[in-house]
Amino acid sequence: MATNYIFVTGGVVSSLGKGIAAASLAAILEARGLNVTIMKLDPYINVDPGTMSPTQHGEVFVTQDGAETDLDLGHYERFIRTKMTKRNNFTTGKIYSEVLRKERRGDYLGATIQVIPHITNEIKDRVIAGAQGHDVVIVEVGGTVGDIESLPFLEALRQLAVQVGREHTLFMHLTLVPYIPTAGEVKTKPTQHSVKELLSIGIQPDVLICRSDRMIPPNERAKIALFCNVAERAVISLKDVNSIYQIPALLKSQGLDDFVCERFRLTCPEADLTEWEQVLYKQANPVGEVTIGMVGKYTELPDAYKSVNEALKHAGLTNRLSVNIKYIDSQDVETKGVEVLKGVDGILVPGGFGYRGVEGKIRTAQYARENKIPYLGICLGMQIALIEYARNVAGLTKANSSEFDKDCEQPVVALITEWQDAEGNTEVRTDESDLGGTMRLGAQQCHLVSGSRARELYGKETIEERHRHRYEVNNTLLPQIEKAGLKVTGLSADKKLVEIIEVPNHPWFVACQFHPEFTSTPRDGHPLFAGFVKAAYENHKKSVK
């Protein structure tokens, strides 16, 4: 079967939800038995989002093979079974870097390097490479049509549609159809102008996804179809919903998957959305609720912790609970004290970088440990828990991380200078290494200690989880901390790096160096998050007695 391409663009304004729409369509097509993958093309000049501020760009999603990617890839993995790789996300910066590298190497035989054909050819080559082995590949272009940054991507996709044949390509355009209260009606003009912008660069959309706060009336859909030269059945109304997991059913109810399959002449069974119906049922019928306090430094933008937020919701589905997330700035713990932590049923300290707010996180870990509140530490959250235990239990009063104090006397957390990647290759890092692309990244094996809470939760001895860090537990000082009672319950494949720690004589205190949120899905959840939310609910029931 030839590979079929769906190109997804956005118009009028940004943040319409192209990624969610693309992932939802992929979920329906997958439910019809098709092998689907999704790619994200980002117009910014950064090589990847690895060094971008989380408060500007949101979280960095890490793939199995260690690529630092856009948060939309997290949505893709939560909606479909296909795992993303470094082939599923690339930026303008990465494209230009590769073209310039080839030019220096002499690959272009002295040609004058230009956007067309060299940049566009590189884009096309990467899209085709990422599509190998799949029935359908959905390609999302970041940004908004009309932005100068996205023009090379749009031109490349226009050319690709000609090369592979229009019978194997479909352009899907998301637009805003705003409702004007004073007029009492939705307005289609922004959509018409957005399509006109696409037409000016040679792209005629085949499907229009119309975003609004309500369903688009049939007469307005007919109007959009007429003036935008699109089949009326291909004008899809995508209203605001309470849960993003309602969107696959909403798109299917309007026949989008049927239209796509007919366009590509694919013969496949009807989509079975039973799993998604179960997700929605659990979401709509919780038997209780819990409040989780998330203590971090990027709390002004919840998207900075997107996968953690979703993983907590998934754990709620697993336990039939509604999970409320209370975002707490770790600096508030420093300035206002632990009073800001009162009233939460469980405490989660996610990953992060830099010294700002660290002492507040350490006080948070101490509060959770001493008051028997369920605690889940992730990446930095584990290092924080270790520092707190070293200072207040093990007698290492000057314990710290060399990330925060290079000259600290008791660096219980220090820079990893050498480690093995998932393929067994040795990676080396020094203080002079670049910040970008030099961390321990991607899926790594972890061995769980028999009898530990982690082993009980996972139900197996060896697991594989994704990492993104450059600091680790210092094994030189670890024996003194273990002697004071801290349990190391997870170790790397070579048994050299600490992956999981647990505090004994506590209802639930588990911290991990890896990022379990990256592998949590609404259909399957994740054992660590499920166990944490369950423990938080037990704590909640005690507090309301």
From Swiss-Prot:
Per UniProt, Mg(2+) binds at: D72, E140
- What top-level class of enzyme does the UniProt entry assign? ligase
Q: Which UniProt keywords apply?
A: ATP-binding, Glutamine amidotransferase, Ligase, Magnesium, Metal-binding, Nucleotide-binding, Pyrimidine biosynthesis
- Taxonomically, the superkingdom here is Bacteria
Activity regulation, per record: Allosterically activated by GTP, when glutamine is the substrate; GTP has no effect on the reaction when ammonia is the substrate. The allosteric effector GTP functions by stabilizing the protein conformation that binds the tetrahedral intermediate(s) formed during glutamine hydrolysis. Inhibited by the product CTP, via allosteric rather than competitive inhibition.
Q: Where is the active site?
A: C379, H515, E517
Q: Name one Pfam family in it.
A: CTP_synth_N
UniProt region (Amidoligase domain), positions on chain: 1-266
Catalysed conversion reaction: UTP + L-glutamine + ATP + H2O = CTP + L-glutamate + ADP + phosphate + 2 H(+); L-glutamine + H2O = L-glutamate + NH4(+); UTP + NH4(+) + ATP = CTP + ADP + phosphate + 2 H(+)
Binding-site positions, L-glutamine: G352, L380, G381, M382, Q383, E403, R470
Known EC number:
6.3.4.2
Q: Tell me, what is one Gene Ontology molecular-function annotation carried by this entry?
A: ATP binding
Residues that bind UTP: S14, K187, T188, K189, P190, T191, Q192, K223
Cited InterPro entries? Class_I_gatase-like, CTP_synthase, CTP_synthase_N, GATASE, GATase1_CTP_Synthase, P-loop_NTPase
Query: Which parts of the sequence belong to the Glutamine amidotransferase type-1 domain?
Result: 291-542
List ligand-binding residues for CTP: S14, D147, I148, E149, K187, T188, K189, P190, T191, Q192, K223
Residues at which ATP binds: S15, L16, G17, K18, G19, I20, D72, K239, D240, V241
Q: Copy the pathway line from the protein's UniProt record.
A: Pyrimidine metabolism; CTP biosynthesis via de novo pathway; CTP from UDP: step 2/2
Misc: CTPSs have evolved a hybrid strategy for distinguishing between UTP and CTP. The overlapping regions of the product feedback inhibitory and substrate sites recognize a common feature in both compounds, the triphosphate moiety. To differentiate isosteric substrate and product pyrimidine rings, an additional pocket far from the expected kinase/ligase catalytic site, specifically recognizes the cytosine and ribose portions of the product inhibitor.
Family statement:
Belongs to the CTP synthase family.
Assembly, in brief, is:
Homotetramer.
The job of this chain, per UniProt, is described as: Catalyzes the ATP-dependent amination of UTP to CTP with either L-glutamine or ammonia as the source of nitrogen. Regulates intracellular CTP levels through interactions with the four ribonucleotide triphosphates.
The protein depicted here goes by the name CTP synthase
Q: Which organism is it from?
A: Haemophilus influenzae (strain PittGG)
**Gene transcribed to yield this protein:** pyrG
